[in-house]
Amino acid sequence: MNQEVMNLFNPTAPTQTFDQIKISIASPERILSWSYGEIKKPETINYRTFKPERDGLFCARIFGPIKDYECLCGKYKRMKYKGIICEKCGVEVTLSKVRRERMGHIELAAPVAHIWFLKSLPSRIGLLLDMTLKDLERVLYFENYIVLEPGLTSLKERQLLTEEEYIDAQDQYGEDSFTAGIGAEAIRELMMALDLEKIAADLRVEIAESTSELKPKKLAKRLKLIEAFIESGNKPEWMIMTQIPVIPPELRPLVPLDGGRFATSDLNDLYRRVINRNNRLKRLMELRAPDIIIRNEKRMLQESVDALFDNGRRGRVITGANKRPLKSLADMLKGKQGRFRQNLLGKRVDYSGRSVIVVGPELKLHQCGLPKKMALELFKPFIYSRLEAKGLSATVKQAKKLVEKERPEVWEILEQVIREHPVLLNRAPTLHRLGIQAFEPVLIEGKAIQLHPLVCAAFNADFDGDQMAVHVPLSLEAQLEARVLMMSTNNILHPANGSPIIVPSQDIVLGLYYVTIQKDNEPGEGMVFGSVSEIEHALAVKAVTLHAKVKARYTTKDADGNSYTEVVDTTPGRMMVGELLPRHPNVPFDLVNRLLTKRDISKMIDVVYRHCGQKETVIFCDQIMALGFRQAFRAGISFGKDDMVIPEEKAKLVEETQTLATEYEQQYIDGLITQGEKYNKVVDAWAKCTDRVADVMMQKISAVQIDPETKREKQINSIYMMAHSGARGSPAQMKQLAGMRGLMAKPSGEIIETPIISNFKEGLTVLEYFNSTHGARKGLADTALKTANSGYLTRRLVDVAQDSIITEEDCGTIGGITVQPVIEAGDVIVSLGTRVLGRTTAEDVMNPATGEVLIPKNHLIDEADVDTIEEANVQGIKIRSVLTCEAANGVCGACYGRDLARGTPVNMGEAVGVIAAQSIGEPGTQLTMRTFHIGGTAQVVDSSFIESNHAGTIKIVNRNVVKDSNGVLVVMGRNVQVQIIDEHGGERASHKLTYGSRLKFDDGDKIERGQRISEWDPYTMPMLTEVNGIAEFEDLVDGVSIREVADEATGISSRVVVDWRASPRGSDLRPAVVVKDKNGKILKLANGNDARYLLSVDAILSVDNGAAVHAGDVLARIPTEGAKTRDITGGLPRVAELFEARRPKDHAIIAEATGRVEFGKDYKNKRRIIVHPVDESLEPIEYLIPKGKHISVQEGDVIEKGEFILDGHPAPHDILAISGVEELAAYLVNEVQDVYRLQGVAINDKHIEVIVRNMLQKVEVTSPGESITLPGEQLDRAEFDEMNAKLEAQGKTPATAVPVLLGITKASLQTRSFISAASFQETTRVLTEAAVSGKVDQLVGLKENVIVGRLIPAGTGGMLQRLRGEAQNRDDKILEDQGGATPTASTEIKEPAEGAA
């Protein structure tokens, strides 16, 4: 107790507030200033007395007493001797916790190189001295001498000499004529002799004068390091240590176990080795031992210090007694178990508990059920203080007894304590911020936590044994934040897409679906009801059923808020739901007057939230939930095996397809089609068959059946109800239950040709069962692997985006990006309205027909505006985007737009970066877990025709078509587009036509909805002739460039172009088909070139030598890949590839300028393509393309800047360089969205944009102007702008730079904050780099602040920082006003302050 009393009298000094943290290399003086004494002996603790040995690693004299206020020998005990140093044992009487703070040091007998600066690549010592790492190690580990001072001899400075050479040189030149050294001492002398300023100046000159490509890069690296040393004030020789600090003993504890053994930290072993070797070296030096022995001892000392700092970085790993590698200081920081990630970013929490969750349907949305036992334990301190306040107990001990006995008054007090005190519930894995929410606890019996059913979706929880953790917010501020920000009722919308996340599912959906069914000829049809109570009465006496068609009176409000009633045609069930709807003019009864599926319910909740606000929505959701559960229970829906109806038509359909497959097989045997074409066709046929069986089955199951006697409709099929309502199951699963399972994929992703004809009801044959195991097993394996991958992706995303915070209301930029609807194969997949909802306009939005302003600029687009945009049929809108935001640090509110989770403009201090990362990462994990649900059934992703979705007139842009010999229109151009124009002349749809597709309509034709515009063969890419004439082969040498490939199965041969470069004879062949006229002259094409069509490898010839061809005929076909299934497996790695900005394997080659294409002279095995730009001032651009790749342009084509010369995925860096930031952003956003859309996951574009903004935070200097930067140097965009602003202020030429795209891992490691980077990856490298350049961390991001233990500068934590900043500015202004007479003085004071910081 006396300890506490004392603490009242001397309150501990509050920790000093600090604004930044600097890291640099410790000088020997600095190390000594930390130390409380030198450690001379390797001993630790006396094993009999358990007292620390004097001058040893645990010495009490150096580090402080073991017991509070008690010296070692026991002469001084108690507080009153505080601060006295005992004359007998030399220990200061003070708190024992100083043993956690005080450091010691070891005085080394010989200097030692710090391994981090030596071995962490690039080696800093090596760069400084301009020596290779190999040479350095030779000197440091005593293999070679190095010449320090050649004197008048013919030796060179820094020349390495072996032992023999050194002795020879001494003999030859005399011992004193030159100096050579060995070991760290020699390196240290070289370091001390460096004149950094001079070297820097020399290097600058050298870089300016150098002509080669690589040299300046190398020199620039060295120059950068030297400048870092000059700027930071670090001295190079500090990288060689003469003292070693020893960390406090409590941080490397030694604990006696029973049985006389000790458990110790590995560091003690490592320190002991260093001390032993150091002492031995000292003794040998005193004894004047032979040089070779001393050298050996010094080498061993160097090795032991290396092991202490970073064990295993060089040479063998030092192991302990049990053969396990010892954990060195570097290992303490590194990795998931290191200091950063284990203790600083991932702390454990007191006042928490965990238990299994069960469903609590009678809870309100803001409540959770907390077991009494748990609550009693968690709220103990509150209960104690209440007991004391009420006078029921005098001491804490008494209170403890009362609580342990569980007296009745304790329960009463617990009820009081718990009232209005929210608790946090968390379910691991916490993938997004909705994984932790606050609830008000309700005490319950039992041992399981009760959870409200509607929040399950947010937690991704189910009740099959999931556990959840409970945390108690203690302080008033914490309770306030929990209630205002984290309460489940405040988190109704999903932060990723702004749709409601509190959506009923499963039983509730089924109940609501059942209630809203409408049937004919029910008892009570046509009755009229005046109120809901009448309906309830009628239902109770069975005068009417839930599903009867009746009329009823519904009361609602008009726009002025007055009530009025209307009579509606509805059913009693729908009236029950309608009764719960909040009354509002914009919430019509039509919302519930329909068959409610999950999607309708979600829409209904969304509408209610937008118009009636949060409170109404929460009440409404709770009521719907209760109704849904009650009705599902009353309905008693169940299903049996007979509910799975297998259609009779199945046998017929299967038989038809079987004959088709046999027919294709026969065609293949006859040699009419290739193996690949047969495979594709068979797979196609079976996929169609499966779909048709599924359709027939769905019609069968969903058909309404009438009972002949009562004329009433029969009960709807239960399985259909479940799937159709969205409660459970999907058509895909029903197809497998009662249709046919269909095609299966091999583990490689290829589709097996033979489908599974049976369904689960019939049962699979052994062979079918075996085929289906592939998919099932792959699904399970995928799940395990990808959960980890997805988690890692989220971690990288969070790390790159963590310092994107809303820092200002509006940055005032005029920039923005233009957004258009997403159209695929003519379908509008994402409408323009959906894409711009919640964004700020960058320009006025005009009505394309009338030209009037629909929405002014700088206006936040809401739902009403979206309707306006859709009605006016606007095609594109320029909106503000975080990509073009000009806020100095963070992002501004106007560029970000709406906060999706609240539906309001985003607040200041919102951590939008983390929200973006979670929104992208969270579904990744969800999706990876969802691969095996469809049991690996293959879905062929393919389209081979375009259908019109609108009626209108056809308009063909860049029309380049010909009629072939059959009179069919064939597309000959690569950028032909077809547009459908409505009667007002507005463009309804636009499709790009593939080369070689067959057109059904021509320019100006009328088209109806659903008619096919064009068709093409999806399996091959044709090569067409543009002129009529006679086809002749060129360079098609049998056996070299062309082979008759006889199909093994059929014996029929087709002529295939083979890789002609493989044989020596074919090296200069250029296989082609030329078209000649009757006289044998090569015909000319429209663009003036010869009609020569170059062939690529694997092309299959379709014409014979000398055959007559007609324009538009196919000369050759190039087979495309077989259909592989796409599932998120392709997805997750694809998302990672995009965010990491990797170059794809076969990346596309993009034209850098608009120009004419010409084929140059081939180079080895590459084709040379030259683009002659239209703009005369530009040089022609050459591209080398591997032969055999199919090039999508012909000689003489005009290609636009940004178009593909070689198809494939484009490399994002190319898009940035050629088309700019906006194009790059559009590409990345669309590609990422494609992956997620395939899985039906909605993510708002702005989240992806936030990540892309952080990938573009660096710029590369192109011309340095008058700055001190170097060409090719990468700078932070903010740093670059600051630098240029300073240069302009001084009237100097500013530097110019281009944006650089970095992958997320690289961008995270290159943030301005070294603390954040070190806690992410490659800790050693980051810290080494930061220390050398004396980096300062300004603590602006979230992560750095968590690590140093401060509030994060976002949300409520950001408020304090802003206030402090404002106060600081105010003070500065006042000082400036007061010192108005002498402004110069104040500026002078400021300069060194900046420098000092």
Curated annotation (Swiss-Prot):
Cofactor requirement: Mg(2+); Zn(2+)
GO cellular component: DNA-directed RNA polymerase complex
GO molecular function: DNA binding; DNA-directed RNA polymerase activity; magnesium ion binding; zinc ion binding
A Pfam family that the UniProt record links to this protein: RNA_pol_Rpb1_2
Keyword flag Metal-binding: yes
Binding site for Mg(2+): D462, D464, D466
GO biological process, alphabetically ordered: DNA-templated transcription
Free-text cofactor note: Binds 1 Mg(2+) ion per subunit. Binds 2 Zn(2+) ions per subunit.
Binding site for Zn(2+) 2: C811, C885, C892, C895
Entry keyword set: DNA-directed RNA polymerase, Magnesium, Metal-binding, Nucleotidyltransferase, Transcription, Transferase, Zinc
Extent of Basic and acidic residues compositional bias: 1388-1397
Listed EC numbers: 2.7.7.6
Residue sites binding Zn(2+) 1 per the record: C71, C73, C86, C89
Source organism, top-level taxon: Bacteria
Catalysed reaction, written as an equation: RNA(n) + a ribonucleoside 5'-triphosphate = RNA(n+1) + diphosphate
Chain spans, region Disordered: 1368-1397
HAMAP family: RNApol_bact_RpoC (MF_01322)
Subunit structure: The RNAP catalytic core consists of 2 alpha, 1 beta, 1 beta' and 1 omega subunit. When a sigma factor is associated with the core the holoenzyme is formed, which can initiate transcription.
Family recorded in the similarity comment: Belongs to the RNA polymerase beta' chain family.
Function: DNA-dependent RNA polymerase catalyzes the transcription of DNA into RNA using the four ribonucleoside triphosphates as substrates.
Protein known as: DNA-directed RNA polymerase subunit beta'
Organism listed in the record: Parvibaculum lavamentivorans (strain DS-1 / DSM 13023 / NCIMB 13966)
